[in-house]
């Protein structure tokens, strides 16, 4: 009956208690050191619950348990691990992850219930993939750029599907991309279909650990397939008969090696590159062309909107800052406020 139905808040508490009981039962079981070999260096290729796939120095991948003292382990982490020995004839013991090296960077995403969650580590570069289909959205590009600046990870903007552009369309797209080139961002124009522009992209990926970000349908998986080769193909669903756009199928973060050198972490977490956990000041700092004008407004509490004496707005009016970037800045702030309002309402729901 409806009167006995659990509320959302009660359901969350029941699920949380269940997960705590499961975790306690797992942690009670410790591991016998005699079952494992000598410590070795490795990198986490993927994480599955209480297990991780670790790649050793010789390129072999080993399924490992994780020491309960390790509080956080994600794809890209560099670790100390030990291989499992044969416990009995025909029975092999999984390896075990003993320790995690300090991270050079960590990619996170906000979560309504768990706060900020790490999804990948030691990223050198975030490749922001856009395309003219489903639409060329500068707002989405700007959101990713704010995330990159906040995480202090270098961005690379890649515009895919240029084979669909005629001369007029190419001129328009180049004009839009000049907005980013003019403020110091690198932009590459490619086609995963014709493979135009892939060579400069390969060079930009060599020697780095990258992660590809972008909205659904821009061809991230197709682009990765072209770069990785068929032996490492990241599968995509058949193109939708209704929309004509590819469907996203990646379910767990995983690290792949490019044949030309460099690595990529393919992760579904970047689809939800939320910014609502950031403060407005962090969003402002995420627009690099604003930096020279910060602190020069007439009022210290300037909102950089209709405030009198706003140095940033004056720069927009003088053409020193692109109007589209300024508009997207306020769209991001508005969307953050809306999401935080929904989150606060959800948190009070019993």
Swiss-Prot record:
Principal cellular location given in the protein's record: cytoplasm
Residues annotated for GTP binding in this entry: 160-163, 214-222
One Pfam family per UniProt: RsgA_GTPase
Residue ranges, compositional bias (Polar residues): 1-17
Binding site for Zn(2+): 297, 302, 304, 310
SUPFAM superfamilies: P-loop containing nucleoside triphosphate hydrolases
Region entry Disordered, spans: 1-24
InterPro entries according to UniProt: G_CP_dom, NA-bd_OB-fold, P-loop_NTPase, Ribosome_biogen_GTPase_RsgA, RsgA_GTPase_dom
Cofactor(s) in the UniProt record: Zn(2+)
Subcellular location: Cytoplasm
Transmembrane segments: none
One of the record's GO cellular component terms: cytoplasm
Keyword annotations: Cytoplasm, GTP-binding, Hydrolase, Metal-binding, Nucleotide-binding, Ribosome biogenesis, RNA-binding, rRNA-binding, Zinc
Enzyme class: hydrolase
Domain CP-type G residues, every copy: 104-273
Enzyme Commission number(s) of this protein: 3.6.1.-
Gene3D superfamilies on file: Nucleic acid-binding proteins, P-loop containing nucleotide triphosphate hydrolases, Probable gtpase engc, domain 3
GO MF annotations, alphabetized: GTP binding; GTPase activity; metal ion binding; rRNA binding
HAMAP family: GTPase_RsgA (MF_01820)
Similarity section: Belongs to the TRAFAC class YlqF/YawG GTPase family. RsgA subfamily.
Function according to Swiss-Prot or TrEMBL: One of several proteins that assist in the late maturation steps of the functional core of the 30S ribosomal subunit. Helps release RbfA from mature subunits. May play a role in the assembly of ribosomal proteins into the subunit. Circularly permuted GTPase that catalyzes slow GTP hydrolysis, GTPase activity is stimulated by the 30S ribosomal subunit.
Assembly and binders: Monomer. Associates with 30S ribosomal subunit, binds 16S rRNA.
This protein's name: Small ribosomal subunit biogenesis GTPase RsgA
Organism listed in the record: Salmonella schwarzengrund (strain CVM19633)
Lineage summary: Bacteria, Pseudomonadati, Pseudomonadota, Gammaproteobacteria, Enterobacterales
């Amino acid at each position: 009956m409806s009167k006995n139905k659990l509320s959302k808040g009660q359901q969350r508490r029941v699920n949380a208690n269940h997960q705590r009981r499961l975790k306690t039962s797992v942690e009670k079981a410790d591991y016998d050191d005699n079952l494992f070999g000598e410590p070795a260096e490795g990198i986490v290729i993927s994480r599955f619950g209480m297990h991780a796939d670790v790649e050793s120095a010789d390129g072999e991948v080993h399924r490992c348990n994780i020491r309960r003292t390790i509080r956080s382990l994600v794809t890209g982490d560099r670790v100390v691990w030990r291989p499992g020995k044969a416990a009995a004839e025909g029975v092999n013991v999984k390896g075990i992850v003993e320790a995690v090296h300090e991270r050079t960077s960590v990619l996170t995403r906000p979560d309504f219930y768990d706060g900020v969650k790490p999804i990948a580590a030691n990223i050198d570069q975030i490749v922001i993939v856009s395309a003219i289909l489903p639409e060329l959205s500068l707002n989405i590009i700007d959101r990713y750029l704010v995330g990159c600046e906040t995480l202090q990870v270098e961005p690379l903007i890649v515009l895919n599907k240029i084979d669909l552009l005629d001369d007029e369309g190419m001129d328009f797209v180049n004009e839009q991309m000049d907005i980013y080139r003019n403020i110091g961002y690198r932009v590459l124009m490619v086609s995963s279909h014709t493979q135009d522009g892939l060579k400069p992209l390969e060079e930009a990926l060599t020697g780095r650990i990258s992660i590809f970000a972008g909205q659904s349908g821009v061809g991230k998986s197709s682009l990765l397939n072209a770069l990785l080769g068929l032996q490492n193909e990241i599968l995509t669903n058949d193109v939708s008969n209704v929309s004509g756009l590819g469907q996203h199928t990646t379910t767990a973060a995983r690290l792949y090696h490019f044949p030309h050198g460099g690595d990529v972490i393919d992760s579904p977490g970047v689809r939800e590159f939320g910014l609502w956990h950031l403060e407005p000041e962090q969003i402002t700092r995420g627009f690099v062309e604003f930096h020279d004008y910060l602190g020069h407004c007439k009022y210290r509490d300037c909102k950089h909107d209709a405030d009198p004496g706003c140095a940033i707005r004056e720069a927009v009016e003088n053409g020193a800052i692109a109007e589209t970037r300024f508009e997207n800045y306020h769209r991001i702030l508005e969307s953050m406020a809306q999401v935080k309002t929904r989150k606060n309402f959800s948190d009070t729901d019993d």
